[in-house]
Amino acid sequence: MWSSSSSLCRNPSFRRAWLSTVTVTQTAAPTSSRLAALRTQLATEEASIDDFSSTNAPTTTTHYTSSNGSPIVRQKAAPRSAKILPKPRWLKAAPATSDNYRKLRDTVRELGLATVCEEARCPNIGECWGGGEDQTATATIMIMGDTCTRGCRFCSVKTSRAPPPLDPHEPEKVATAIAQWGLDYVVLTSVDRDDLPDQGADHFRQVVTQLKLKKPSLLVEALTPDFQGNMDLVHAVATSGLDVYAHNMETVEALTPKVRDRRATYRQSLEVLRYVKTIQSDPIGTTNNHNNNNGCLTKTSLMLGLGETDDQVLTTLRDLRDADVDVVTFGQYLQPTKKHLPVQEYVTPEKFDFWQETAMGMGFAYVASGPLVRSSYKAGELFLQKYIAQKKQRNAEVAAA
């Protein structure tokens, strides 16, 4: 019964077009009539190339009936559920080309250091590693392994309930390598280690202490986990001799359960930062500490573009000032993989400027805000601005006494 149209039906392109756009029930009508009706229906359909693409086809199951009465089922591909926003032009970073950048890059590989700068493909690596006359060269080193016990929905670091054990020689090896690197400022960060009795606090402390012993002039920032809110562990790291204690809030309170691991709560992170300021009057760590007995600066970072509102950001800033946090940075959230939270908004540079002005007006000592800003962005530069101002103030007070 298909003899008069067999060559047409054997054509693959025709069969695909027919099955994706038409529901046909075979009857006993003459072949010429069926073919004429089919041509008429095809002519009235406004099919485009998207109708033949599996990524754009509708999510429907269409049932057909063959000439012998047997059912034919065609499952069309599902569309992508979340619309992917195109990246705006302001998220393009200039390539890193300076001599100092290349020197530090080669040294990192020679010494076998693991830097967040490279592993996270940070867009600011050229600025931070490049240094210059008006800023120090800065890098962020990850310690305690590359596997985290938590699974935050914005982060692409590997996760496991039982990561490999800590390397007991890491504090000495990392301190020796960094001391040889020629940096002025280093940021130490780590994965969460909820599998350890002290969550790695003593290990963190040892790395800082060894660094200060080997290179007293080196400025050290510790970007720490929340240590499950155990303030004894926070105290151990805060009094290790570091210059800046950083712990990231990441986002506003309303979005925290969605964005971060369930064990990382907004209030717990806020209390970690608050507690560090309460021990400012304690002697901090070693005699090589640059802040003497004045304590260390506290710092946190917020990602924008996750769906937060202006009122929520303002509330977070008020909470941070109430906790006496010194430094805050704002940066654009970027989805690391399709499995992670999608970007809800690409915040404009003008809006980042607004948040910088707003935060400075609220009394923060320093604010870095921009689409490509990350928590350790130009860390050495922002610390030195604060440190030099404090030093001048102390000198003026001594002279006036």
UniProtKB/Swiss-Prot annotation:
Pfam families: LIAS_N (PF16881), Radical_SAM (PF04055). It is found in: Mitochondrion. It is an enzyme of class 2 (transferase). Its main location: mitochondrion. GO terms for cellular component: mitochondrion. It catalyses: [[Fe-S] cluster scaffold protein carrying a second [4Fe-4S](2+) cluster] + N(6)-octanoyl-L-lysyl-[protein] + 2 oxidized [2Fe-2S]-[ferredoxin] + 2 S-adenosyl-L-methionine + 4 H(+) = [[Fe-S] cluster scaffold protein] + N(6)-[(R)-dihydrolipoyl]-L-lysyl-[protein] + 4 Fe(3+) + 2 hydrogen sulfide + 2 5'-deoxyadenosine + 2 L-methionine + 2 reduced [2Fe-2S]-[ferredoxin]. [4Fe-4S] cluster 1 binds at C117, C122, C128, S376. Pathway: Protein modification; protein lipoylation via endogenous pathway; protein N(6)-(lipoyl)lysine from octanoyl-[acyl-carrier-protein]: step 2/2. Binds 2 [4Fe-4S] clusters per subunit. One cluster is coordinated with 3 cysteines and an exchangeable S-adenosyl-L-methionine. SMART domains: Elp3. It comes from the Eukaryota. Keywords: 4Fe-4S, Iron, Iron-sulfur, Metal-binding, Mitochondrion, S-adenosyl-L-methionine, Transferase, Transit peptide. Residues 49-79 are annotated as: Disordered. [4Fe-4S] cluster 2 binds at C148, C152, C155. Disulfide bonds: none annotated. Its cofactor is [4Fe-4S] cluster. Belongs to the radical SAM superfamily. Lipoyl synthase family. This is Lipoyl synthase 1, mitochondrial. It comes from Phaeodactylum tricornutum (strain CCAP 1055/1). The lineage of its organism: Eukaryota, Sar, Stramenopiles, Ochrophyta, Bacillariophyta.
